[in-house]
Amino acid sequence: LPHGRLNALILPHVIHFNAADGTAAEKYGRLAKLCGLAANPRSLAAGLNRLRAQLKLPERLSACGVEGKELTAALDGLAEAAQADLCAPSNPRPAAAEDLKSLLRELA
């Protein structure tokens, strides 16, 4: 799955996850306002979902050819790789392996 396509799918979910951090929520709200949306993380995520739909990008991994069984089999490795990524420590909210698996399951 291309990196950009996966980002288009997962970014709204990541915004919801990170918005539990007050500082991140505030920054997402400012970004939403700059985009002409209501100044909150939910509006930003919804706006990204609308943009994804306008670009005719898929909403689910299954629409990209990733089957549920395939995803389930890969979850542990994907979560481990995400936690090992050099960018992971800079995420506004620490993500445990189960958090990452949950985000991916939301995309199934």
Regions found by a protein language model. Name each.
Residues 1-73:
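Gly/Pro-rich interdomain helix-loop hinge
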